[in-house]
A protein has these predicted regions:
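Extended substrate-binding grooves/exosites of carbohydrate-active enzymes
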Residues: 1-203
């Protein structure tokens, strides 16, 4: 906190992401303890936490206590969270996790969850996601339809080694994730241009 609190790039602090204590009786206390430290050391910025256990955190007060409640995926539960929480806003602390391979196009083109193919690739049409994630269109629709969604952090900007979903149980020869907007060679996938068209109106 001390190292970065004077940096204008810092807009909020995060006290965790998908912490295992979200549903435990001590989770609320630990989160409040950490948030209080952030408030004490930097009273100018709010605090968030990336939460993936939506049922728990809405019921046990965990999400209601955080300055900016961040939901990881669960786009279908944003409205429920907004209705139940006092903050009147929701942050997409992890969004999309769409899976795609650059330059690979699968037919027929339709939305699919956890689709697998013999070539261990995913379609570049950006219509495939994991069982727990979604495609970018859902996040864009939330932002367009609800003023109380204040932004999103996409998982992920770049592919990375590890988590080769949807092939994590039959990974060979996959070593790389397929979540990235940009692949391991630093080349943009089709999704890069989709995000750019939404976020950069000058492009």
């Amino acid at each position: 906190l001390h190292n970065y609190r004077n940096n204008p790039c810092v807009v909020m602090w995060s006290i965790g992401n998908e912490v295992p204590t979200q549903c435990s009786p001590v989770g609320y206390k630990v989160a409040k303890f950490l948030q209080d430290i952030c408030h004490r050391e930097d009273p100018t910025r709010p605090v968030t936490c990336g939460m993936d256990q939506v049922t728990c955190v809405l019921a046990n007060g965990f999400a209601a206590m955080i300055d900016i409640p961040g939901l990881n995926y669960r786009a279908n539960r944003y409205q429920e969270a907004y209705d139940k929480l006092p903050q009147n806003l929701i942050l997409g602390s992890e969004t999309a996790s769409t899976v795609s391979s650059r330059g690979v196009y699968k037919f027929p083109v339709k939305d699919k969850k956890s689709a697998q193919y013999d070539d261990h690739q995913c379609s570049s049409y950006d219509v495939e996601a994991c069982s727990w994630s979604n495609i970018p269109d859902e996040d864009f629709a939330l932002a367009d339809d609800h003023h109380w969604t204040i932004g999103q952090f996409v998982w992920t900007g770049f592919d990375y080694l590890g988590e080769p979903s949807p092939y994590d149980t039959d990974a060979w020869p996959n070593h790389s994730s397929m979540f990235g907007i940009i692949d391991l060679a630093s080349l943009p996938k089709d999704r890069y241009y989709l995000y750019r068209s939404i976020w950069n109106k000058e492009a």
